[in-house]
């Protein structure tokens, strides 16, 4: 195989055929189906969800592996391609902003003008004495998430300064903090005195915080991929587009959590 067939001779982003978008859509469908069955109390639905979630992780790993090969071995991620990927990711974050804006809209729609069915008060009758104290686990999780943002920034600037060891240390700390945050969320859910079916308050609370938790899981996967690429010398101080996208995503989750903490945990309760 000569160089003309092994490397592309243009700077543009020509998408090669890949099975992973199709497989990702399939496993996402089964994830949603399993979650719906679990909420309706179907037997063995949690096992079904676990299997489908493992399929999601496997598909993401295989897709990331192919993208890493295209970028680091095939040389497909030229400056023009990298610029296009960054613009696409920024547009994706804008769409995510509107998604969370709709959730906050639903929350304020119910809380600013509570109906008679809710007792004309917020939190609703029966929930007011069950809300989660914002100065306990939520405050700890806020500190953890903001600290993870600082350690991730440290890792980024260490990579730019060609200090691979400190970049890895910063990423290790960020990933450890992300697991602590998810553990705090799981503990909070397990001990919460209300459920997702307890009025619009419970639905808004679990939908907003749960969706944010899913974003933290996805962000952790992105950072794990970046850690692997730095560890295997695939990323340099000038070539780390995937890592930068993961950083943008993580800081986006930080900002969303601050809004969640101030509105739902403090003001809303």
UniProtKB/Swiss-Prot annotation:
Gene Ontology MF annotations: cytochrome-c oxidase activity
GO terms under cellular component: mitochondrial inner membrane; mitochondrion; respiratory chain complex IV
EC number: 7.1.1.9
Subcellular location: Mitochondrion inner membrane
Coiled coil: none
CDD domains: Cyt_c_Oxidase_III (cd01665)
Catalytic activity: 4 Fe(II)-[cytochrome c] + O2 + 8 H(+)(in) = 4 Fe(III)-[cytochrome c] + 2 H2O + 4 H(+)(out)
Main location: mitochondrion
Listed GO biological process terms: mitochondrial electron transport, cytochrome c to oxygen
SUPFAM superfamilies assigned to the protein according to its UniProt record, in alphabetical order: Cytochrome c oxidase subunit III-like (SSF81452)
Pfam families for this protein: COX3
Membrane-related topology note: Multi-pass membrane protein
Entry keywords, A to Z: Membrane, Mitochondrion, Mitochondrion inner membrane, Translocase, Transmembrane, Transmembrane helix
Transmembrane segments: 19-39, 44-64, 87-107, 135-155, 170-190, 205-225, 247-267
Cross-referenced InterPro entries: Cyt_c/ubiquinol_Oxase_su3, Cyt_c_oxase_su3_dom, Cyt_c_oxidase-like_su3, Cyt_c_oxidase_su3-like_sf, Cyt_c_oxidase_su3_a-hlx
Domain of life: Eukaryota
The family this protein is said to belong to: Belongs to the cytochrome c oxidase subunit 3 family.
Task performed by this protein: Component of the cytochrome c oxidase, the last enzyme in the mitochondrial electron transport chain which drives oxidative phosphorylation. The respiratory chain contains 3 multisubunit complexes succinate dehydrogenase (complex II, CII), ubiquinol-cytochrome c oxidoreductase (cytochrome b-c1 complex, complex III, CIII) and cytochrome c oxidase (complex IV, CIV), that cooperate to transfer electrons derived from NADH and succinate to molecular oxygen, creating an electrochemical gradient over the inner membrane that drives transmembrane transport and the ATP synthase.
Subunit structure: Component of the cytochrome c oxidase (complex IV, CIV), a multisubunit enzyme composed of a catalytic core of 3 subunits and several supernumerary subunits. The complex exists as a monomer or a dimer and forms supercomplexes (SCs) in the inner mitochondrial membrane with ubiquinol-cytochrome c oxidoreductase (cytochrome b-c1 complex, complex III, CIII).
Protein name: Cytochrome c oxidase subunit 3
Lineage: Eukaryota, Fungi, Dikarya, Ascomycota, Taphrinomycotina
